[in-house]
């Protein structure tokens, strides 16, 4: 199975479209989104092509191939408009004998990791 990993779209239809094109071009089976999908956050400038109302249907059209974790700019209102789970702080993926912990990095990171065993991977 081929995975593509992306993060921090911040409502940019420009970057969401590029991500979707890369996903299709690379013939990936699944897309792992590491948060910050629709909102840019109060500390950030508007990203190029900011259009969250266009990003929503693009992502919802891929919902059967997505796994997503929450970013620091994601909120409950995002879950109301997205048709796939977006509010988990992390996801755990078994890969062979290892576990891959997928997270945005604002809760779990290299300084404050989730419970990792030797050889596990933190994204």
Predicted regions and their residues:
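Conserved beta-sheet core of the metallophosphoesterase superfamily
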Residues: 87-88, 96-99, 106-123
């Amino acid at each position: 199975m081929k995975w593509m990993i992306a993060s921090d779209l911040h409502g940019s239809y420009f970057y969401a479209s590029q991500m979707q094109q890369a996903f299709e071009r690379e013939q990936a089976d699944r897309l792992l989104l590491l948060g910050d999908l629709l909102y840019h956050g109060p500390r950030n400038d508007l990203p190029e092509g900011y259009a969250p109302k266009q990003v929503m249907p693009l992502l919802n059209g891929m919902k059967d191939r997505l796994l997503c974790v929450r970013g620091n700019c994601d909120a409950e209102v995002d879950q109301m408009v997205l048709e796939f789970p977006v509010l988990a702080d992390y996801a755990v993926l078994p890969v062979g004998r290892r576990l891959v912990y997928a997270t945005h990095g604002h809760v779990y990171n290299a300084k404050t990791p989730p419970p990792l065993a030797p050889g596990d991977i933190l994204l």
